[in-house]
Curated annotation (Swiss-Prot):
Function: Catalyzes the methylthiolation of N6-(dimethylallyl)adenosine (i(6)A), leading to the formation of 2-methylthio-N6-(dimethylallyl)adenosine (ms(2)i(6)A) at position 37 in tRNAs that read codons beginning with uridine.
SMART domains per record: Elp3
Major localisation: cytoplasm
Binding site for [4Fe-4S] cluster 1: 33, 69, 108
UniProt entry tagged with the keyword Cytoplasm: yes
MTTase N-terminal domain: residues covered: 24-145
Cofactor note: Binds 2 [4Fe-4S] clusters. One cluster is coordinated with 3 cysteines and an exchangeable S-adenosyl-L-methionine.
Species the sequence originates in: Gluconobacter oxydans (strain 621H) (Gluconobacter suboxydans)
Protein name: tRNA-2-methylthio-N(6)-dimethylallyladenosine synthase
Length: 475
């Protein structure tokens, strides 16, 4: 940890839990992936003993954390723009007699650009990478003592897992769905991706730790968890017996937790789809029939340039095996168009793969160079207008497939986890095994239950249906 004398003294902090209600406001701004959502919740957890409780507006906060993402283009400039806004809010609070708001930058931009942040925004108090949020209380105390900014961007991911709070997070209490990080980092080094440089090497959380948090979540009312990891199907957590457990084995153990009726996982890498995971989709009804399996391109030449480690046909074969094991399995994926060197032939290969597979959902983006990644320095960068055209064509095909998938739901009966009231009086809502929002008439007491619903209509981004009342059951 390094300390830079660049900011006025912070409010004094306590290392003991308060005896009354949380006297300090905490506002967390989260950008990026589901793992950042999980990390933001855990940062709030570790700050609770210092008296911090959530507030909805940064204007009411004694501490603001900006949890950042470095994946998309212009991520760093977006951070500095937001920091400028937060500085104005802090200055206005102080002019009205409030204590000085602590401004912290966390996440992947902090990891990659920590020193730059303190140089360009010296009013920032704390800079911490995604593996060090468990050190937040120490960092707050140190910054208060030193009267300066504190930066912590090491990669002690094992320590992060060791120091997770042992009680159920307020963010999951009362919620029916939750994220649970089980693996971090990436060893794949795809040419376009910054994750290995911001999240570090692949590391898996011990089985006992995962199970303990999942049990706490279930006891607090969570009925569906999504297991998170940059390469979640590369999970190899310590099993406590001198060996390691696979993702399939972990899912089997999680499915035995009372009250936990649904399990999902993301994000997967095609190289790590093994037979045990395929068998889990066949044998474990708690594992939802919806899989996010990014392929990025349908061209073998571009896949090689991306350093993906598999071919388009190997991806097709993995999908074939998964669908053979679980015929109702639906897929989503990620695509990048305009990777350096991509030709019209390469792009057409991607379009053909999409036609061959058929996706229920997908995310597609134009390639944008990320500083420090191999692809950023590759020749034959594709012109922006070409990338725009290809992206539009790909997205049109993907939308067509998503619409067809949703249309195929009409006339089927789906098990819906009821999560909330609907927008209309007398209406409740939930989500299908395929993550589609479903709205239907029903009583509020069904919230938290899994019910069977006959799907009768499809809308642009949701489904409508009729409750089959006699099948209502607890998840």
């Amino acid at each position: 940890m390094t300390t830079a004398p660049t900011s006025p003294a912070l409010p004094a902090s306590s290392d003991t839990a308060p005896t009354g209600p949380a006297p300090r406001g905490l506002h967390v701004i989260t950008w990026g992936c589901q793992m950042n959502v999980y990390d933001s919740a855990r940062m709030a957890d570790v700050l609770r003993p210092l008296g911090y409780g959530p507030v909805e507006r940064p204007e009411d906060a004694d501490m603001v954390i900006l949890n950042t993402c470095h994946i998309r283009e212009r991520a760093t400039e977006k951070v500095f723009s937001e920091l400028g806004r937060l500085r104005k809010i802090r200055d206005e609070r102080m002019s009205n007699g409030a204590d000085r708001t602590i401004i912290a930058v966390a996440g992947c931009v902090a990891q990659a650009e920590g020193e730059v942040i303190l140089t360009r925004a010296p009013y920032v108090d704390l800079v911490l990478g995604p593996q060090t949020y468990h050190k937040l209380p120490e960092m707050v105390a140190r910054a208060a003592r030193a009267g300066g900014a504190v930066i912590e961007t090491d990669f002690p991911v094992e320590q992060k897992f060791d120091f997770l709070p042992t009680d159920a997070a307020p963010q999951t209490q009362g919620n029916l769905t939750a994220f649970l990080t089980i693996q971090e980092g990436c060893d794949k080094f795809c040419s376009f991706c910054v994750v290995p440089y911001t999240r570090g090497a692949e590391t898996s959380r011990p089985v006992a730790s995962v199970l303990a948090e999942a049990r706490r979540m279930a006891e607090s009312g969570v009925r569906e968890i999504t297991l998170l990891g940059q390469n979640v199907n590369a999970y190899h957590g310590d099993d406590g017996k001198g060996g390691s457990e696979t993702l399939a084995g972990l899912v089997e153990q999680l499915a035995q937790i009372p009250g936990l009726g649904r399990i999902r996982y993301m994000t997967s890498h095609p190289r790590d789809v093994d037979q045990s995971l395929i068998d889990a989709h066949r044998d474990n009804p708690a594992l939802m029939p919806f899989l996010h399996l990014p392929v990025q391109s349908g061209s073998d030449r571009i896949l090689k340039a991306m350093n993906r480690g598999h071919t388009a046909d190997e991806y097709r074969e993995s999908v074939r095996k998964l669908r053979e094991a679980r015929p109702d399995l639906a897929l989503s994926s990620d695509f990048i168009v305009g990777h350096p060197g991509e030709t019209e032939e390469d792009f057409e290969a991607t379009m053909q793969l999409v036609r061959d597979i058929g996706f229920a959902m997908a995310y597609s983006f134009k390639y944008s160079p990320r500083p420090g990644t191999p692809a950023a320095g590759q020749p034959m960068q594709v012109p922006e207008d070409v990338k725009d055209r290809r992206l539009a064509e790909l997205q049109a095909l993907l939308r067509e497939q998503q619409d067809a998938f949703n249309a195929d739901m009409v006339g089927t009966v789906q098990e819906i986890l009821v999560t909330n009231r609907g927008r209309k009086p007398g209406q409740i809502a939930g989500r299908s095994p395929y993550l589609q929002p479903v709205h239907f008439d029903g009583p509020d007491h069904l919230i938290g239950s899994t019910v069977k619903v006959a799907i009768t209509t499809r809308r642009t981004n949701s489904l409508g249906g009729t409750l089959i009342r006699e099948t209502a059951s607890a998840c």
